[in-house]
């Protein structure tokens, strides 16, 4: 797994959390990655760790008649925000071209993964990617972040990136380049913006 700026102690802590999830909920984590500013490539010293994972239950869970909860969310602490989606839910979201899940699959910070399963899942992305949905998702995100983060008298530099990144993703999609990369630097490099 690539390090990408996450120190060994934090990686160990994340892996320990994932092991606890597996034991507590009787699931198997197939994939775990970093989302948010660390995955986008512009974490600040006070950034938390947004750990996202995909998991499967034991076979008997899938034989129940009543629908079961398909999300695992741990209480957020000062450093860790850990949340996962059940595998069937993830497949449905991928089929619906969910940009958030597609970003997770492109994260440069991977804590653990089942290589064979993830290779098959990633191979589905190009056929289910929807430029229309991606454009709308990123445009809506930029608008929401602009309203939430850039309206005060003092704005932290990092908050501008929360607006710029989705706008660059919109440009990427509108240019017909396919799935936008998760990393801000890649989006910027591929944006073909003219210098001032």
In which residue ranges do the predicted regions lie?
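Conserved nucleotidyltransferase catalytic core and NTase-mimicking acidic/glycine-rich helix/loop elements
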Residues: 122-196
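A basic- and aromatic-enriched beta-loop-alpha substructure that forms the phosphate/nucleotide-
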Residues: 64-141
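Short loop/turn segments at secondary-structure transitions that flank enzyme active sites
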Residues: 57-60, 97-100, 144, 169-170
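Helical scaffold of the NTase/Pol beta-like nucleotidyltransferase catalytic core
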Residues: 1-33
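Catalytic metal-binding acidic patch
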Residues: 36-77
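Short, well-ordered loop/turn elements at secondary-structure boundaries
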Residues: 27-28, 47-49, 157
């Amino acid at each position: 797994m690539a390090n990408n700026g996450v120190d060994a102690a934090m990686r160990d802590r994340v892996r320990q959390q994932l092991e606890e999830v597996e034991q507590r909920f009787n699931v198997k984590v197939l994939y775990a990655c970093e989302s948010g500013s660390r995955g986008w490539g512009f974490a600040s010293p006070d950034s938390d760790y947004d750990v996202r994972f995909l998991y499967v239950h034991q076979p008997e869970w899938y034989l129940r008649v009543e629908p079961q909860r398909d999300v695992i969310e741990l209480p957020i602490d000062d450093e860790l925000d850990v949340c996962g989606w059940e595998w069937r839910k993830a497949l449905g979201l991928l089929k619906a071209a969910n940009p958030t899940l597609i970003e997770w699959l492109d994260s440069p910070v991977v804590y653990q993964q089942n290589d064979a399963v993830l290779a098959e899942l990633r191979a589905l992305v190009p056929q289910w990617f929807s430029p229309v949905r991606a454009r709308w998702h990123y445009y809506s995100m930029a608008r929401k972040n602009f309203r939430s983060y850039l309206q005060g008298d003092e704005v932290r530099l990092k908050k501008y990136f929360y607006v710029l990144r989705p706008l660059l993703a919109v440009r990427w999609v509108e240019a017909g380049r396919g799935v936008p990369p998760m990393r801000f630097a890649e989006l910027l490099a591929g944006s073909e913006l003219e210098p001032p």
